[in-house]
């Protein structure tokens, strides 16, 4: 279970060089097997609730770093586990206070955008979390950022 990422490089001719212009990032998320969950666990599951799943960082200065906080709450009846996390951009930094939340517990996830790295990736910045919530085993926080023109 977890997330695996790699890059595939395409070439049209023999001798083509590997570079960002012919790179295709590939990621695979293997979700937890919830088929062996007990009756009690299936009737009392953990439930993840995020304060936001879309963040916007408008009008950043070219070398600016700016942060926002997403609250993660377990509104379910058993412990919530954030089992894996993948950050899909070198422009993002993520700090998560806790990976296991008891029922009713909340933690903070701080997401920082580094404006100088925004243009370096082809994919849209996002954070993918793998959880033991049977209804949301995979949850994504999307990030939009724009840089002011000088």
Please identify what each model-predicted range represents.
Residues 56-58, 96-101, 115:
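Beta-strand-rich interaction surfaces with strong enrichment in secreted/lumenal proteins
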Residues 11-71, 75-76, 134-150:
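Long, low-complexity ectodomains and other extracytoplasmic segments of secretory-pathway proteins
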Residues 100-101, 110, 140-143:
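Long, contiguous C-terminal modules that act as interaction/assembly or targeting platforms
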Residues 111, 127-128, 136, 140:
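Short hairpin/turn module used for nucleic-acid contact or packing/dimerization
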Residues 1-10, 21-23, 62-69, 116-128:
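Short, solvent-exposed loop/turn segments enriched in Ser/Thr/Gly
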Residues 77-106:
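Surface-exposed binding patches on compact interaction domains or structured appendages
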Residues 55, 105-111:
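Short strand-edge motifs at loop-to-beta-strand transitions and within beta-strands
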């Amino acid at each position: 279970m977890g997330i695996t990422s790699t890059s595939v490089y395409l070439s049209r001719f023999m001798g083509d060089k590997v570079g960002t212009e012919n790179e295709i990032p590939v990621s695979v998320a293997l979700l937890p097997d919830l088929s062996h969950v007990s009756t009690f666990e299936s009737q009392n599951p953990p439930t993840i609730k995020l304060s936001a799943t879309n963040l916007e960082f408008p009008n950043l200065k070219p070398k600016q770093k700016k942060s926002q906080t997403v609250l993660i709450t377990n509104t379910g009846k058993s412990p919530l586990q954030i089992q894996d996390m993948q950050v899909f951009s070198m422009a993002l930094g993520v700090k998560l206070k806790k990976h296991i939340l008891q029922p009713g517990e909340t933690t903070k996830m701080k997401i920082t955008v580094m404006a100088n790295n925004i243009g370096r990736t082809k994919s849209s910045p996002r954070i993918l979390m793998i959880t033991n919530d049977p209804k949301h085993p995979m949850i994504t926080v999307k990030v939009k950022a724009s840089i002011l023109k000088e």
